[in-house]
Swiss-Prot record:
It is found in: Cytoplasm. The gene is metK. GO terms for molecular function: ATP binding; magnesium ion binding; methionine adenosyltransferase activity. Binds 2 divalent ions per subunit. InterPro entries: ADOMET_SYNTHASE_CS, S-AdoMet_synt_C, S-AdoMet_synt_central, S-AdoMet_synt_N, S-AdoMet_synthetase, S-AdoMet_synthetase_sfam. HAMAP family: S_AdoMet_synth1. It comes from Prochlorococcus marinus (strain MIT 9313). This is S-adenosylmethionine synthase. Catalyzes the formation of S-adenosylmethionine (AdoMet) from methionine and ATP. The overall synthetic reaction is composed of two sequential steps, AdoMet formation and the subsequent tripolyphosphate hydrolysis which occurs prior to release of AdoMet from the enzyme.
Length: 419
């Protein structure tokens, strides 16, 4: 019997890097909402008293970027007396956006393909490799450690926003260690929560007293509600529960650490449980395959698992800049497949159109901000891009395609047995 512990982390929306992801995606939303053909590569930097947005944009949209940035920062919770050295109203906002390089644009606008299919004319915006993953550990077909870490981070933010724990401040991190036996989760070994807080907590000022109070409150108001509907729950006696191990966490957010777009790519995906191609998502329009193809790879992997063709599936895609069709497609089922990896790969090649133009069209990636009232990508920028039933993400809706795959596999097996 194999036994091991696997750990994943998440962060709250007030973490400096996540502030940047949300600002970058808010810029993307604003541009696509007005001009769905906008080309966007927006990077954000924050530190004490400063937010800088930079990158490349080609768009007909007219956006007040400074007003937009301040609204995002304010919504996260950095405003007024509780801003902690980074205030939406008073921080400097610098905008340094250029136009997209014409050399990149020509490859996307007119792919190196001479077929009559218009989708063949939309080339990948860059070279790269992307991975998608799914497994049957949770209802949303995500690995349990990252799913739990996100649940805790969302609940931590929720009790701050609703005032249940009024001493909490925006910055925070969660980490969950899960015990596996024979590759199945059997227990929650450790939960770690680091959360920013006021210098006094409900009249308590000594460090030990503050930590004891926060520990008690977080178990009651965060851990228990976040895990209440799960079959595998933490146990107050058996699960190690660590809170602010350094003792206190008063200075946080951009006052404590600089933040940058794209530095939480493992939090955004599978918590380290699956491989990652290295490309970040936030601030990038759908022609960037770092984003759109990673969404498609997740869709494919989830379809395979939802169809019962594998308990675990990892899909690798690769692209060349200016070329529409993927350079390669590979499926790995880690020995859990109903059929071989080669057969799974063949099913994917036959039933999924993974050209960038087709991915964009299938998921309506350019239209989503307009369809969702001017805001879509910003909400994916915190608490993960996958396994989010709260957001109704199109790449998570696999019911119809999974059924098609199952029928195709059954037909394939029937034909094979008749030979």
């Amino acid at each position: 019997m194999s036994r091991y512990v696997f750990t994943s982390e998440s962060v709250t929306e007030g973490h400096p890097d996540k502030i940047c992801d949300q600002v970058s995606d808010a810029v993307l939303d604003a541009l696509l909402a007005q001009d769905p053909s906008s080309r966007v590569a927006c990077e954000t930097v924050v530190n004490t008293g400063l937010c800088l947005i930079t990158g490349e944009v080609t768009s007909n949209a007219q956006v007040d970027f400074i007003h937009l940035v301040r609204n995002v920062i304010r919504e996260i919770g950095y405003s007024g007396a509780r801003a902690g050295g980074f205030d939406a109203t008073s921080c400097a906002v610098l905008v340094a956006l250029d136009q997209q390089s014409p050399d990149i644009a020509q490859g996307v606008n007119e792919a190196d393909d001479h077929s009559g299919d218009p989708l063949d004319k939309v080339g990948a915006g860059d070279q790269g490799i992307m991975f998608g993953y799914a497994c049957d550990e949770t209802p949303e077909l995500m690995p349990l450690p990252i799913s739990l870490a996100h649940r805790l981070a969302r609940q931590l933010a929720a009790v701050r926003h609703d005032g249940s724990l009024s001493y909490l401040l925006p910055d925070g991190k969660t980490q969950v260690s899960v015990v596996y036996e024979n590759d199945r989760p059997v227990a929650i070994d450790t939960i770690l929560i680091s959360t920013q807080h006021t210098s006094e907590v409900e009249g308590i000022s000594d460090e030990n007293g503050i930590r004891e109070r926060i520990t008690q409150d977080l178990w009651t108001h965060v851990v228990e509600p976040a895990t209440a509907d799960l079959p595998l729950k933490p146990n107050r006696e058996a699960t190690r529960f660590l809170v602010n191990p350094t003792g206190k966490f008063v200075v946080g957010g951009p006052q404590g650490d600089a933040g940058l777009t794209g530095r939480k790519i493992i939090v955004d995906t599978y918590g380290g449980y699956a491989r990652h191609g290295g490309g970040a998502f936030s601030g990038k329009d759908p022609t960037k395959v770092d984003r759109s193809a990673a969404y498609a790879a997740r869709f494919v992997a989830k379809c395979l698992v939802a169809a019962g063709l594998a308990q675990r599936a990892e899909v690798q895609l690769s692209y060349a800049i200016g070329v529409a069709k993927p350079v390669s497609i590979l499926v790995e089922s880690f020995g859990t497949g109903k059929v071989t990896n080669d057969e799974l790969t063949a099913l994917v090649q036959d039933h999924f159109d993974l050209r960038p133009g087709a991915i964009i069209e299938q998921f309506k990636l350019r239209q989503l901000p307009q369809q969702r009232g001017g805001r879509f990508y910003q909400d994916t920028a915190a608490y993960g891009h996958f396994g989010r039933p709260d957001l109704k993400l199109p790449w998570e809706d696999v019911t119809d395609k999974a059924s098609t795959l199952l029928q195709a596999e059954a037909q394939q097996q029937k034909q094979g047995s008749s030979l």
